[in-house]
């Protein structure tokens, strides 16, 4: 059966090509607008794995829905299918073969969405909202890892209603990432734990947070041999930490940098400081993107410790981001991120997902 079977798309929005969008402050970078974007804040984005031909994009939103688009080479986006939770969708991920999508929600459940049949079934249950979800593909097991505000990390065989394993967290799970054989989980009260996933998941190390404020997002990075070797951690205080697991020189190799602040990083002038909402590493170059509540995205070279690019300011926060499997497309979501609370939420404000050609802008800075 073909991917998505015979499911119909959603919405009736038009499509646009690379470089043909209008120039206003909702899209100052003139990037491609994804058609039929969600009707409420977009919390998460994820592109399909390289095992699938073509590119498919998943987004979860505070309208309780999960949407899937096909992204064509021209930049045109085609709505393919949609599923619902009974609460906001906080995280999404793909199975390694691209046949399933996993979704985590405030309704305290996680679901598995079979894209061939367009059927979704519950695969996980927590006692509080499920904040993170990741697929783990090990040589001897496959499972889904869910992190929750109930202070647990659970591992699920999708064929069973009971977890394979439950690990207690020191606090509520705020963000997580997985690249086998490594997982990292950041919690409330600045908790930070690295797990090793070989044979079976187990705690590897607790790390004193390099950041002084609440953790917001985390992404694992790889070395030149394509092995996970460290992570980038973002906070609500406009700062990112680059942390290696086993660096030759910790004091020199680990560092933090300021980002998503007004007036650049000139500390002599008063600054508005914004949350870092998302971090994504380029799958080819190893450079990274950050997105923030200031309504900008930035590209960075962590090895050269330099900024490659900062976008113009959008008229609302950039809430999530991600690269496709070969790094040619950068997706970012423009919508309210709740960083200023409910009183600043405007339900009339449209939400957008934009696609940008990322092939050139993420190339690392030449070494002198």
Swiss-Prot record:
PROSITE patterns in UniProt: WD_REPEATS_1, WD_REPEATS_2, WD_REPEATS_REGION
Subcellular location: Cytoplasm; Nucleus; Cytoplasm, Cytoskeleton, Spindle pole
Gene3D superfamilies: YVTN repeat-like/Quinoprotein amine dehydrogenase (2.130.10.10)
Keywords from the named record: Cell cycle, Cell division, Cytoplasm, Cytoskeleton, Mitosis, Nucleus, Phosphoprotein, Repeat, Transport, WD repeat
Location of the region described as Disordered in the Swiss-Prot/TrEMBL record: 15-34
Pfam families named among the record's database cross-references: WD40
Main location (coarse class): cytoplasm
WD repeat segments: 37-79, 84-114, 125-157, 168-206, 215-255, 271-301, 310-346
Residues recorded as bearing Phosphothreonine in the entry: 229
GO biological process, one term: transcription-dependent tethering of RNA polymerase II gene DNA at nuclear periphery
Complex formation: Interacts with NUMA1 (via N-terminal end of the coiled-coil domain); this interaction promotes spindle formation in mitosis. Interacts with NUP98. Interacts with MYCBP2. Interacts with USP11.
Function of the protein: Plays a role in mitotic bipolar spindle formation. Binds mRNA. May function in nucleocytoplasmic transport and in directly or indirectly attaching cytoplasmic mRNPs to the cytoskeleton.
PANTHER family linked to this entry: MRNA EXPORT FACTOR AND BUB3
Similarity comment text for this entry: Belongs to the WD repeat rae1 family.
Protein name per UniProt: mRNA export factor
Organism: Rattus norvegicus (Rat)
